[in-house]
């Protein structure tokens, strides 16, 4: 296994690479991967692709079928209760992926075929299923219905518009932000301001030395302006 920086991922794919596993949007700072470049590099060398869409599903347009596997935690931008997650596997790859963790719901005949050795699994994706957390997925059903009603294009436009407003406001106030068009805005070295924002009722996080602020469907321009108000202008660095 090799770990490479995000910007070098596509160039790091080699003829000996079997699988490229990466996140569409980075949890640490919100950067968006060059999805097309990584897919092209993987295809050129016959490598499989596994995309973690946890930080993008729910606001970023994605075609799951463009990747051999996708995995997604539901509790982020999909607004699902904790305990929900989703896996997609292309039909081609399903034939080569062992169903190692299949439970009774994956049986070809769940109510009769799982007493004794589990010999026959359901065809297709259901053969990978495990018993779900029923209450969590009941909540997920409604969350996903809401997002589907709004539509990914509208969610993307709303979230990235707010993020762009926040990014511009931070730059005007002297802060250095991670560039890009993500719905996640990060300011390196500002993680120490997270408690102050929390006191003001603003929920942000501070991963990997960054102040990370995410915009989604429930946020407004007033929320963005409130963040800028609390942070204020960056204090000038002391001269040497």
Which positions does each model-derived feature cover?
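Pyridoxal 5′-phosphate
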Residues: 1-240
